[in-house]
Amino acid sequence: MSQPTVALLGTGTMGEGMARNIAAAGMPLRVWNRTASRAEPLADVATVAGSVAEAVRGADVVLTMVYDVDSVAATMEEARGELGADTVWLQQSTVGVEGSERLAALAEDLGVRYVDAPVLGTRKPAADGALVVLASGPADVRPRIDPVLDAIGSKTVWVGEAGAGSRLKLAANAWVFTVVEGIAESLALTRDLGLDPALFLEAVQGGALDAPYVQLKGRAMLDGGFDPAFALSGALKDADLILAAAAGAGLDLGVMTGVREHFQRAVDAGHGDQDMSATYLEH
C-alpha cells in the first residue's frame, strides 16, 4: 500500500513534533496553523499551506491537533467542500465526551470517516515519536492510518467505537493531574514543615512510591523549570472536561474538584502559559 498523503492542522506544542515524524516516515505532508508563523519552521519537511482548504485538498488523512472542540470544529468547517469521500479524519485534540460526539456528527455531515484518537504524552514524546495513541473508530480504516499512527507513537491502543478514545483520555488525564497536584502538595508540606523540599524526592526515589514522572515534575517545581510541556491553561480546560464527563456519568470526583481549584488559582495568578507543574508556585 502506498503512503497516505497527510494534512496536519495545528502545529503547536504537539503538532510540530508529530509533523516532523510523519515527514520522516516518508509520507507526503501538508501543514497549516491558525498563526501561520507557527507552521513556517516546518517548511523544510512539509508544504506549508496558506489555508485549511489548501492543506486538506486531496489528502487521504486529515489530522487535527488544536486547542479545543470549538477550534477543531471551526477548522474543519473551513475544509468543507475539499474533503474526499474516502478521507479519514484523525481527530487527536482533547475534546471530552460531548466534544467527541459533536465532532463525530460533524464528520458525518462533512462526509468523511472519523477516528477519535487522542494521545498520551506531551512535547518531548511528540518530538520523539513516542506518544501513546488511544484510537477508536471503524476497523476498516485502520490500515489506512496505521502509517501515521506508527510514525507519531510508540504504541496504539484501539479501545472501541469512535468516542471511546476520548473517554479513556479523560481517565488518564485525571491520573496525571492528580499526580502533579500531589507532588506539589507534598513538596509544599515538606517545605512548610521546615525541611528542604528536595528531601521528599530523595526519600521516595527508587522505592515503591517513586515513578519517573514524580522525579521529572518534582525537580521542575524545585528548579523553576516551567517551560510548557503541558500548559496550565490546557490542563485547566481538560480538568473541566473530566468533571463534566464524571457528572454526566453520575460520579463525584472530589479529588479532581480540588485539583481543578488549584489549577484555576495558578492560572489566575498569571501562570496559565507555564507548565502545569507551576501549580506549585501557588502553594
Locate each region found by the language model:
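NAD(P)+-binding Rossmann beta1-loop-alpha1 motif at the extreme N-terminus of oxidoreductases
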Residues: 1-64, 123
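Hydrophobic beta-strand scaffold residues
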Residues: 29, 48, 113-115, 156, ...
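Rossmann-fold NAD(P) dinucleotide-binding segment
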Residues: 53-112
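Rossmann-fold dinucleotide-binding core
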Residues: 75, 94-173
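Active-site-proximal catalytic alpha-helix in oxidoreductases
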Residues: 129-136, 157, 161-193, 202-216, ...
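Interdomain hinge/lid region at the active-site interface
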Residues: 166, 175, 210-277, 282-283
